[in-house]
């Protein structure tokens, strides 16, 4: 009986030894190499040449000729927008994402920010920094909260993350609207999929964006960045958005037109925003977002998961088993749609 040939797995990440050892133990056919790298030039040519599975965030070979054995790329990101136009986008190998690890922490982050905006947290933080107790009149006029119960939240991108946000928002008594590319289910199998239905949301399509926005007291952006979604929330969209709405963006900066958002905030049409993602990252020191009134800001951390290593091991191990058995992989990136 012929022994199956070994498959070389290369990680450019920084998983602990116990993680790598467990992957080896589960899949003895796998030859596991980890070389933490910031650029492809830090990986020796002989390693590239024998790599069959590449697990990486943003370190890719210069060309297909560098990786003649490559058969699959496992991304350490939920999105694939950073790959379009790169050397690997057109390679005839499957791309898989790490989607499914972050829906719960991201949904909890969104609810935290919805509550923070509703309870005027940006202004409250300003009061704390000023170090002076405001008068009752000032508190009444500037720190009066909104209620989430009975308000409407619109979620742009009603997939795994959006559905979990919708589920939690429903528990707060909010009416939930979801906007998604199609009313059907995306083809393929996905890691961590638990919400089989739309969690009671009223669904819209992108063609109905302005009607959707007109109903939103709160707008949450969770969709992937693609050619279709880039600049989707622009000046025209803010014009259609319900007066005084608040925005939370946990997706990608390029989906929301930052100039249009700034105009909306300063005019009062947008009553507040919570931003975890930006056009330019890292956000430069001195950028107006750091001190923009009415804005809560975090440095792209909404998707951080305390059990990231354990969840990633389960996803990667499942996909390795599928790959070795010739089965369909989880979280396949649809290149036609860009995610």
List the predicted regions and their residue ranges.
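An N-terminal-biased, well-structured beta-alpha scaffold segment characteristic
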Residues: 1-99
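Phosphate-binding beta-alpha-beta segment of Rossmann-like dinucleotide-binding domains, i.e.
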Residues: 93, 99-152
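Oxidoreductase and adenylate-handling cofactor-binding alpha/beta cores
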Residues: 107-126, 167-174, 314-327
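A short, charged, Gly/Pro-tolerant segment at domain boundaries
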Residues: 127-137, 328-339
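Glycine-rich Rossmann-fold phosphate-binding loop(s) that bind the pyrophosphate
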Residues: 158-159
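N-terminal Rossmann-fold NAD(P) dinucleotide-binding loop
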Residues: 162-163
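Rossmann-like adenosine-cofactor binding region
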Residues: 183-288
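Adenosine-phosphate binding glycine-rich loop
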Residues: 283-284, 292-314
């Amino acid at each position: 009986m012929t022994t199956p040939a070994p498959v070389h797995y290369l990680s450019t990440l920084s998983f602990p030894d116990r993680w790598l050892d467990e992957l080896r133990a589960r899949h003895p056919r796998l030859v596991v190499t980890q070389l933490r790298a910031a650029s492809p030039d830090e990986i020796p040519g002989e390693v590239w040449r024998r790599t069959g599975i590449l697990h990486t965030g943003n370190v890719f070979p210069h060309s297909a000729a560098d990786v003649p054995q490559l058969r699959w790329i496992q991304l350490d990101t939920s999105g694939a927008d950073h790959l379009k136009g790169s050397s690997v986008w057109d390679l005839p190998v499957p791309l898989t994402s790490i989607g499914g690890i972050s829906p719960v922490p991201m949904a909890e982050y969104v609810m935290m920010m919805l509550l923070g905006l509703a309870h005027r947290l940006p202004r409250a933080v300003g009061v704390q920094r000023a170090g002076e107790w405001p008068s009752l009149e000032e508190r009444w006029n500037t720190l009066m909260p909104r209620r989430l119960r009975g308000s409407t939240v619109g979620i742009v991108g009603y997939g795994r993350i959006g559905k979990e946000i919708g589920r939690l928002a429903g528990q707060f008594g909010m009416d939930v609207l979801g906007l998604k590319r199609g009313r059907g289910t995306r083809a393929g199998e996905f890691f961590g999929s638990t919400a089989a239905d739309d969690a009671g949301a009223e669904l819209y399509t992108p063609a109905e964006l302005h009607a959707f926005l007109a109903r939103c007291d709160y707008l949450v952006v969770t969709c992937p960045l693609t050619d279709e979604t880039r600049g989707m929330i622009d000046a025209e969209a803010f014009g259609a958005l319900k007066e005084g709405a608040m925005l939370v963006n946990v997706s990608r900066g390029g989906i929301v037109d930052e100039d249009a958002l700034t105009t909306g905030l300063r005019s009062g049409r947008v009553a507040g925003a919570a931003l975890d993602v930006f056009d330019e990252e890292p956000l430069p020191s001195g950028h107006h977002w750091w001190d923009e009134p009415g804005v809560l800001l975090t440095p792209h951390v909404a998707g951080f998961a305390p059990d990231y290593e354990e969840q990633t091991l389960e996803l990667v191990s499942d996909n390795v088993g599928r790959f070795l058995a010739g089965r369909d992989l989880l979280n396949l990136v649809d290149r036609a749609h860009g995610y």
